[in-house]
């Protein structure tokens, strides 16, 4: 993909900032990184510039996306004793890259993409703070793979994500029912 073929960024409802940059950030970041990071939901100029300034283009100092997310303190620090989980809070830190990813996660939560659906599902499970951390963790892993592997981001719609999630839930319930000696059967929804 050449710079001229870069698709338009997703429509955002933002206002112009007082300190606008004098160059086209999308084109320059594409030239520097080789991937259009602005296609990730929630990513804007500030997020991309902050991540690149904090991590650099070379992500080889982190062996995997899990190490990268851990460095950002976006992984739960599960503490166990006697086989029982006593705490699973993330480590507190002042990492500016993690803060940028958290802001991007909040923004991504308002979109109609798979990350937006993921955010809403996690918000129902863990509350707003847990959803922000979980979505920021997912964004960190996506960022790592896109930059390191030079892959383009292929977004999925929220409807497709929800359908896959429903299919996973159905498979899980079918397996649990079979383990208990029951069989699940679909009921006609004609009421």
Q: Where are the language model's segments positioned?
A:
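A detector of single, family-specific signature residues
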Residues: 1-191
């Amino acid at each position: 993909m050449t710079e001229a073929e870069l698709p338009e960024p997703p429509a955002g409802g933002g206002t112009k900032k007082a300190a606008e940059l004098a160059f086209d950030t999308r084109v320059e970041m594409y030239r520097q990184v080789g991937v259009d990071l602005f296609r990730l939901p929630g990513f804007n100029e500030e997020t991309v510039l902050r991540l690149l300034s904090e991590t650099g283009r070379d992500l080889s100092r982190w062996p995997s996306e899990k190490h990268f997310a851990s460095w950002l303190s976006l992984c739960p620090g599960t503490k166990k004793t006697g086989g029982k989980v006593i705490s699973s809070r993330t480590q507190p830190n002042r990492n500016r890259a993690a803060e940028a990813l958290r802001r991007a996660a909040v923004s991504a939560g308002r979109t109609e993409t798979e990350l937006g659906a993921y955010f809403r599902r996690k918000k129902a499970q863990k509350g707003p703070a847990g959803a922000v951390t979980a979505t920021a963790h997912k964004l960190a892993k996506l960022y790592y793979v896109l930059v390191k592997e030079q892959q383009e981001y292929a977004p999925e719609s929220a409807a497709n994500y929800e359908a896959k999630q429903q299919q996973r839930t159905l498979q899980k319930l079918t397996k649990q029912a079979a383990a208990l000696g029951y069989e699940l059967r679909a009921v006609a929804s004609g009421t």
